[in-house]
Curated annotation (Swiss-Prot):
Thermal response of activity: Optimum temperature is 70 degrees Celsius. Active from 30 to 75 degrees Celsius, inactivated following 150 minutes incubation at 85 degrees Celsius.
The name this protein goes by in its record: Alpha-amylase
pH dependence: Optimum pH is 4.5. Stable from pH 4.0-7.5, activity decreases drastically above pH 7.5 and below pH 3.5.
Source organism of this protein record: Bacillus sp
Lineage: Bacteria, Bacillati, Bacillota, Bacilli, Bacillales
Function: Alpha-amylase active towards amylose, starch, amylopectin and maltodextrins. Has lower activity towards glycogen, and is not active towards alpha/beta-cyclodextrin.
Protein activity control: Strongly inhibited by Hg (2+). Inhibited by Zn (2+). Activated by Fe (2+), Mg (2+) and Ba (2+).
């Protein structure tokens, strides 16, 4: 289950990369 972290776009990008 993908859950986007409540933060800025930077955080989103970091989460996306870590998702890998």
């Amino acid at each position: 289950a993908h859950q986007l972290p409540m933060g800025t776009l930077c955080n989103f990008y970091e989460w996306y990369r870590r998702d890998d």
